[in-house]
């Protein structure tokens, strides 16, 4: 028995295939899903979705969104997603360093919009870098 996984962003379908197991980056921590999982909806955080198929793991970088598990079908709706194998790790690492610098420049800003944006940029850069290194 397998799962059907669909990962959708507003501008593209990133993944639409079967999987043996998936690990979702939910807002409450990592969530493993196997065939026969109970029906549920969960919020998705910035992070890496891991997909096991035929003994091989693939990674998908995600920004926030939602996931629904229903009858061995998992649908993930996010603002942005990209397959780890399509991410240039050098570019992802450069973006991560840039985001760290941007956040450090705003560290004394309290909860200013600039600091919140810098933290969001850092979270996205971390997810893309991790996904680029996972494949």
From Swiss-Prot:
GO cellular component term of the entry, any: plasma membrane-derived thylakoid membrane
Protein name: ATP synthase epsilon chain
Compartments, as annotated in UniProt: Cellular thylakoid membrane
Membrane topology: Peripheral membrane protein
Any single Pfam family the record assigns to this protein: ATP-synt_DE_N
InterPro entries given in the database record: ATP_synth_F1_dsu/esu, ATP_synth_F1_dsu/esu_N, ATP_synth_F1_esu_C, ATPsynth_dsu/esu_N
Superkingdom of source: Bacteria
Function: Produces ATP from ADP in the presence of a proton gradient across the membrane.
Record GO terms (molecular function): ATP binding; proton-transporting ATP synthase activity, rotational mechanism
Subunit-level organization: F-type ATPases have 2 components, CF(1) - the catalytic core - and CF(0) - the membrane proton channel. CF(1) has five subunits: alpha(3), beta(3), gamma(1), delta(1), epsilon(1). CF(0) has three main subunits: a, b and c.
Biased composition (Basic and acidic residues): 89-100
Compositional bias ranges of the Polar residues kind: 101-112
Family: Belongs to the ATPase epsilon chain family.
Region (Disordered): 89-114
Organism: Prochlorococcus marinus (strain NATL2A)
Keyword annotations of the record: ATP synthesis, CF(1), Hydrogen ion transport, Ion transport, Membrane, Thylakoid, Transport
